[in-house]
Every structure is written in C-alpha cells, then in structure tokens.
A protein has these predicted regions:
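Formylglycine-dependent sulfatase
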Residues: 1-205
Length: 205
C-alpha cells in the first residue's frame, strides 16, 4: 500500500463486534479491508496465550505446537513477524515495509512461562503502597520525572496495603509477580524485532 509491504501481527481489536464471526463479513478485518496485506493473530481484545483463537488472514488455524512443546502466543507472533520481515528483505530489498505488532500482553489473561514470573518472587511482598513510593523515588533519580513532582494520592477504591486481609496479600503479591513477568517476557520479544532492525541499520527509519 502506497509502495509499502504491510503486515499486522497479534491483537486486532478494531473489528466491530458484529463483524468478528469466522463466517464473515470480513470487510473490516486487517487483510481484507483494514489496510494490511498480511495478518496473523486474533480478533478481539484478549485471547488465551497458550490456546489462542488464531487466524491467518481470515482463515482460522491451530497453533503450530502445544504449550507442552513450548508454545506461547507472544513468541509465536514474534517468530512470524521476524520471518516475514526477513522474507521481505530477501525478496524485495528495495521496498519499504510496515509492521503493526500488537501482542496480547499485558492484557488479561496474564499467562506467561513460570520461569519469567519466578524471577519476581518476593519482589512485591512489601505491598503496593511501598512499591509506588520506591518507584516514584527511582523515577526522580533517573530524571524520568521532575524533581518537583509530587506523588499522587492512592485512589480511594484501592485499600491501603496495611488494611488488606493478610490471607489475601500473598495472592495479590503473586498477581503482581505474574504481571511483571508477563511484561518482561513481551519486552524480551519486542527486543528480538529491534535486533533485526538494528542488524539492518534501519531502526531510525
């Protein structure tokens, strides 16, 4: 389109609900009316990261392997995006390309290999009040925010950590561990795309 090769990988939440059926109509789907030549991913706002509702174009398909064999949606779409980019480079080296990469992370469901969540074991046991204070101070130290910035008040809908039921705290801490692992996992795979662009010296394009 306009001289570009185009592809979308991952989540497509732009299709109206009444057009998401696998029977069509497909005029709002990425590769039929959404402006992309190639699409690999899922339609909607969320999907199971181990058993996603996958489509290639408008064709439903099963994941290439099972979770027991190491399947995860983020890794899959990254593999597909890297392969597509390399194919474009090999076949049409002079033609620019556009990749829209939209992983399911960190939208629910928060599903990520255990080794990524275990890296954060115990990191959130102090609770969200202490964590937000530490994060805020670190952002100031790194000049991410101005030195004069003030920490906003905790939303009234969220209880103080000290007031949370002690039996619930381990569950909430584990949820934060999983979220952090999920976020680092997707960051790692985005890094794989960046590595390819750095290899080709096109990251600044």
């Amino acid at each position: 389109l306009n001289g570009y090769s185009t592809a979308q990988f991952g989540k497509c939440h732009e299709v109206p609900v009444w057009k998401t059926s696998p029977m069509g109509p497909f005029d709002a789907w990425p590769s039929r009316g959404g402006g992309f030549e190639h699409f690999y991913g899922f339609i909607g706002g969320e999907t199971n990261q181990y058993y996603p509702s996958l489509y290639e174009g408008t064709k439903p398909l099963e994941p290439p392997k099972s979770p027991e064999e190491g399947y995860h949606f983020t890794e899959d779409i990254t593999d597909k995006a890297v392969n597509w980019m390399r194919q474009q480079k090999a076949l049409m080296a002079d033609r620019p390309f556009f990749v829209y990469f939209a992983p399911g992370a960190t939208h629910a469901p928060h599903q990520v290999p255990k080794e990524w969540t275990d890296k954060y074991k115990g990191k959130f046991d102090q609770g969200w009040d202490k964590i937000r204070e530490e994060t805020f101070a670190r952002q100031k130290k790194l000049n991410v925010i101005p030195e004069t910035a003030e920490l906003t008040a905790r939303p009234k809908e969220i209880p103080a950590w000290d007031e949370v039921d002690p039996n619930l705290k381990p569950v909430l801490a584990r949820q934060m561990e999983v979220y952090a692992g999920f976020m680092e996992h997707v960051d790692h795979h985005v890094g794989r795309l960046i590595d390819v662009m750095e290899e080709w010296e096109i990251l600044d394009d």
